[in-house]
C-alpha cells in the first residue's frame, strides 16, 4: 500500500531535546541569576526560615528552567547536609489555576500526589481548602517552597499570597516552614499588589534580562549537540537563529523554536543538512504559529477589531484613527451576525491589541484646534493575521 509518510530522515538524534518541556541538563549563561537565587535561598540549607522570592523577566528568558534547577539543587543539598530539614518544592502554573482557590487546590493535590490521600475536589469552602494546604505543608516537617509560575494570572484576590507567607506567624503551621517563589512576565503585577502582600512576596527580587545573540548561541550549541546528529547543521544556522531571536525578544524559547522548525523544513524537503534558507522559512512558520496562538486567546470582538485594522492595512489606509476604524469593525461584526460594541470598547480593544504587540499606536498631537488622538497600524504581517483568523474561524469567530 502506498501511504503519505516519508522515509525516515535521521537528522534528529533526540527530538525531545528541542521540545519546550525538555529540562536542560545544564543551565547556560545564567550564572549571575543563579548566584542571586542561591543567596536568596541560602537560609534554607543553613536551617533558617527562607525569604520569599519574586522572579520576573520577559517570556522565554529562563525563569522557569532556572527555578526548577534551583529547586532540585536545594532538595539535593538539604538531603546531603546533616541536621538540615528536608526540602519539598511544589510548582503550580497560575495560568491553569487562575484564582487563589484553584491554585490552593492544585497545590494540595500536587503535595498529595506522592501520598495515598485522595485528591481534593471543588465545592469545599475556601477556608477548608486553605486548611488542607496548611495540613499538607505541616505534614512535611521541613521546608516547603511553593512555586507559583505565571503568578500574574492570579486575578481574583491576594488571599493565597497573603496567607502563605504568614502561615507560621499566624500559627497555621508549626513544625514546617514555607516560602513562596512567584514568577511573572509582568513587572506591573508587583506594583498592583496590596502593600502588605508586596512587602512579603517581594522580599527578594531577581530580574532575568533578555538574552543577547552570543548567549543564545551558547544555549543553542548545547541543545543542538544533544538533539541533532553530527554534521546536520551548516555553519550559519545557529548564529542566524540566535541573531533573529536576540533582535526580536531575546527569548531562548524563540531561538530553540526556530532551530527545531529549520530542521523540520529540511526534513520535509528530504535533505540531510539544514541551511540558512531553512531558517528564513522557519521564521515565517514560527511567527505564524505565535500569531495564531495569540489570536486564539483574543475575545471574539478583539478578533473583529484586529481584522478591521488588517483590512484597512491591506487597503493601504493605515495608520488609521479609531473613529474611522469603527465603521470597518461594525461591518465585520455585522457579517458575523454580531451586535457591534460601543466606540469606547473598541478603543479598549485597540489599546489591548497594541499592548499584545499586534498594533503600533501613534500619539498624534496637532496642537491647539488640531486635537490629540491615537492612530493605529498593524505591527505584524497582514497575510499572517488573515491566515490565522481564517484558521481560528471554526473555533472562535
Ligand atoms: N539558560 C538556559 N540554558 C538552557 N536552556 C534554557 C535557558 N534559558 C531558557 N532555556 C530554555 O528555553 C525555553 C524557555 O525557558 P523558560 O520556560 O525557562 O522561560 P520563562 O522565562 O520561564 O518563560 P515564560 O515566562 O514564557 O514561562 C525552555 O525550553 C528552557 O529549557
From Swiss-Prot:
Stored PANTHER family: CELL DIVISION CONTROL PROTEIN 6-RELATED (PTHR10763), ORC1-TYPE DNA REPLICATION PROTEIN (PTHR10763:SF22)
NCBIfam families in alphabetical order: orc1/cdc6 family replication initiation protein
InterPro entries, alphabetized: AAA+_ATPase (IPR003593), AAA_16 (IPR041664), Cdc6_C (IPR015163), Cdc6_lid (IPR055237), ORC1/CDC6 (IPR050311), Orc1/Cdc6_arc (IPR014277), P-loop_NTPase (IPR027417), WH-like_DNA-bd_sf (IPR036388)
A molecular-function term among this protein's GO annotations: ATP hydrolysis activity
Free-text disruption phenotype from the record: Not essential for normal growth.
Keywords of the record: ATP-binding, DNA replication, Nucleotide-binding
One BP term from GO: DNA replication
Keyword Nucleotide-binding: yes
Similarity-based family: Belongs to the CDC6/cdc18 family.
Residues that, per the record, bind ATP: 61-65, 211, 223
Record organism: Halobacterium salinarum (strain ATCC 700922 / JCM 11081 / NRC-1)
Record has ATP-binding as a keyword: yes
Name of the gene this protein is made from: orc8
Name the record gives this protein: ORC1-type DNA replication protein 8
Top-level taxon: Archaea
Amino acid at each position: 500500500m502506498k501511504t503519505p509518510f516519508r522515509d525516515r530522515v535521521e537528522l534528529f538524534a533526540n527530538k525531545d531535546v528541542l521540545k519546550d518541556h525538555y529540562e536542560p541538563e545544564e543551565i547556560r549563561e545564567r550564572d549571575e541569576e543563579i548566584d542571586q537565587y542561591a543567596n536568596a535561598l541560602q537560609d534554607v540549607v543553613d536551617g533558617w526560615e527562607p525569604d520569599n522570592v519574586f522572579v520576573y523577566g520577559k517570556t522565554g528568558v529562563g525563569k522557569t528552567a532556572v527555578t526548577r534547577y534551583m529547586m532540585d539543587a536545594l532538595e539535593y543539598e538539604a538531603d546531603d547536609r546533616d541536621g538540615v530539614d528536608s526540602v519539598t518544592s511544589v510548582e503550580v502554573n497560575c495560568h491553569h489555576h487562575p484564582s487563589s482557590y484553584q491554585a490552593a487546590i492544585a497545590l494540595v493535590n500536587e503535595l498529595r500526589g506522592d501520598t495515598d490521600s485522595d485528591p481534593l475536589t471543588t465545592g469545599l469552602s475556601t477556608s477548608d481548602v486553605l486548611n488542607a494546604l496548611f495540613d499538607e505543608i505541616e505534614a512535611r516537617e521541613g521546608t516547603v517552597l511553593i512555586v507559583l509560575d505565571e503568578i500574574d494570572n492570579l486575578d481574583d484576590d491576594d488571599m493565597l499570597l497573603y496567607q502563605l507567607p504568614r502561615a507560621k506567624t499566624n500559627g497555621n503551621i508549626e513544625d514546617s516552614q514555607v516560602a513562596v517563589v512567584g514568577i511573572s512576565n509582568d513587572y506591573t503585577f508587583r506594583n498592583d499588589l496590596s502593600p502588605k502582600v508586596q512587602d512579603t512576596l517581594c522580599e527578594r527580587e531577581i530580574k532575568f534580562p533578555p538574552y543577547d545573540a552570543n548567549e543564545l548561541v551558547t544555549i543553542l550549541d548545547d541543545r543542538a549537540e544533544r538533539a541533532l546528529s553530527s554534521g546536520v547543521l551548516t555553519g550559519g544556522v545557529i548564529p542566524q537563529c540566535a541573531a533573529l531571536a536576540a533582535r526580536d525578544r531575546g527569548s531562548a524559547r524563540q531561538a530553540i523554536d526556530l532551530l527545531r522548525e529549520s530542521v523540520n523544513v529540511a526534513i520535509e524537503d528530504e535533505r540531510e543538512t539544514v541551511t540558512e534558507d531553512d531558517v528564513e522559512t522557519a521564521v515565517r512558520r514560527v511567527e505564524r504559529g505565535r500569531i495564531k496562538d495569540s489570536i486564539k486567546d483574543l475575545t471574539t470582538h478583539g478578533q473583529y477589531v484586529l481584522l478591521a485594522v488588517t483590512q484597512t492595512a491591506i487597503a493601504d489606509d493605515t495608520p488609521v484613527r479609531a473613529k474611522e476604524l469603527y465603521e470597518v469593525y461594525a461591518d465585520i461584526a455585522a457579517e458575523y451576525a454580531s451586535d457591534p460594541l460601543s466606540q469606547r470598547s473598541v478603543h479598549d480593544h485597540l489599546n489591548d491589541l497594541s499592548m499584545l504587540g499586534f498594533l503600533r499606536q501613534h500619539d498624534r498631537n496637532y496642537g491647539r484646534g488640531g486635537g490629540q488622538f491615537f492612530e493605529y497600524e498593524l505591527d505584524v504581517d497582514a497575510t499572517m493575521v488573515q491566515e490565522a483568523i481564517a484558521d481560528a474561524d471554526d473555533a472562535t469567530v
